[in-house]
Amino acid sequence: MKYPILFIIFTAEKEFTLTMIKKRYLLADKLRTYISRYGINNFNEEHLKKVGLSIEELKENFSDRQDMVGTILEYERKCFEEIFNEYNFEGWNAIDIMLIVSNEINNRFFNVSPSVTITLSEVFPEIFQDHLQKRSDFIYEKMKINIEKGMQQGMYKNDVSSEMIARMFIAKLNDIHNPQIYPPEDFTFATIFNNLIDNVIKNITNEEGRAYYKQRKQLYSVLNYR
């Protein structure tokens, strides 16, 4: 009889932990909005109320500002990774995968300004660098797999290096955090990411792939508009 009781306790603890994580992510989303408006150095109760937060709530769910920032960046990665978890891309055309990811990025990150991330990188550089490395590793692997899939499907050029293209993409993506290249008031993460995807596809596709990309991009644009 001990094992069922232990199982129930373990299950309850697991559900409680997941609930707490979801709550922290919800708060992190609101914190990003707060930081974009008021910065990270001063948490004013009146300003917090405007984004649906309170000082008491923050103290209950976060140990300090580092914990807040770490959760904000973790949630950003989680939202990105969920796209690949929600879609089963097995058997899909490589170009369609790129377009689906671009559309989902646009839907989920349409209002995410690089200005917040730039602020976080300046105040907590070590936390930010850890985030950047984890995000880069994830995107690199997905990009590399896609390029190799597209080559096998006859959509991408056979003489491209999947590793080199993936690394170049990561380098350009990380330029998002350089305000001299992308002024944060003029660009969102989604806009920059999708433009980079567009440039990559145009550079690595062969004639058949370019024709397919043009056709499918128009289709996805119509579906997304609806």
Regions found by a protein language model. Name each.
Residues L26, K30, Y34-D67, T71:
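Helix-turn-helix
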Residues Y87, V116-L120, I176, Q180-P183:
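Secondary-structure edge/capping motif, primarily at the C-terminal ends of alpha-helices
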Residues M1-F16, K149, D186-R226:
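C-terminal peripheral helix-coil segments that are non-catalytic and often amphipathic
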Residues L99, K144-E148, S162-I170, A190, ...:
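Short, well-structured alpha-helical segments
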Residues F110-K144, M151-V160, M164:
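Short secondary-structure transition hinges
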Residues M1-Y38, E45-E46:
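Basic, helix-initiating cap at the start of DNA-binding domains
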Residues T71, E82-S115, A166-F169:
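Hydrophobic alpha-helical connector segments
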Residues K23, R65, I72, E76-F80, ...:
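Hydrophobic/aromatic residues within well-ordered alpha-helical segments
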